[in-house]
């Protein structure tokens, strides 16, 4: 660890981990990549896809690793579900419903989608071994109506295989809930 990011840019450091407020991810990751460092960034990787694409381009150009902290993909339960899906035990997957809600910790610099949904999105893509081709989302802020950041978001994803996924994330639910339901033909 270091209080000064300059300490991390010298030649004795091969890689950096960025676990700072989201608004700083892009600047710090770009600086590290340009200094020829492999980078792991806590989720979400950046504030928007344009910034993420730029970081990915720099990493590819410099042959560096750029990783995001999607740690749930390595959870034994998620790995077990992946094996069950791949084995065909559930048959053809029709749809997936995912919920990640809790009360509190409203973020000041990102919306609930960027805070909570990256976990579920990475899990979905890992389980299905594909990325969505269509995404729609709607959200709102109820507590802090002056904020530009949603506190509740509903997303629908459609995959090329025809699988649908619904995702609900919220900072306002009175009971913490983490659930994923996978519906298949068996």
Q: Locations of the language-model features?
A:
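C-terminal glycine/acidic-rich active-site capping loop/insertion
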Residues: 71, 181-186
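A contiguous active-site-proximal alpha/beta segment in oxidoreductase catalytic domains
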Residues: 46-108
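Beta-loop-alpha module in the N-terminal Rossmann-like domain of NAD(P)-dependent dehydrogenases
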Residues: 1-58
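Short glycine-/small-residue-rich Rossmann-like dinucleotide-binding loops
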Residues: 20-21, 169-171
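Rossmann-like dinucleotide-binding domain that binds NAD(P)(H)
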Residues: 103-164, 170-175, 181
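Conserved SAM/SAH-binding loop
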Residues: 3-6, 100, 140
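A short helix->loop->beta-strand "cap" motif at the edges of active sites that frequently abuts
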Residues: 35-37, 62-64, 163
């Amino acid at each position: 660890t270091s209080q000064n990011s300059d300490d991390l840019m010298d030649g004795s450091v091969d890689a950096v981990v960025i676990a700072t407020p989201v608004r700083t991810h892009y600047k710090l990751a770009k600086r590290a990549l340009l200094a020829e460092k492999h980078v792991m960034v806590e989720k979400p990787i950046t504030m928007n896809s344009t910034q993420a694409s730029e970081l990915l381009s720099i990493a590819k150009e410099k042959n560096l690793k750029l990783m995001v902290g999607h740690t749930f993909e390595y959870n034994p339960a998620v790995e077990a579900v992946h094996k069950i899906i791949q084995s065909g035990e559930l048959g053809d997957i029709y749809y997936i419903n995912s919920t990640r809600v809790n009360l509190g910790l409203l973020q000041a610099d990102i919306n609930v989608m960027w805070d909570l949904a990256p976990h579920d999105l990475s899990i979905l893509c890992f389980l299905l071994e594909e990325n969505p081709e269509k995404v729609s989302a709607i959200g709102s802020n109820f507590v802090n109506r002056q904020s530009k950041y949603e506190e509740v978001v509903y997303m629908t994803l459609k995959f090329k295989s025809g699988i649908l996924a619904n995702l609900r994330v919220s900072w306002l639910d009175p009971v913490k809930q983490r659930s994923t339901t996978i519906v298949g033909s068996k």
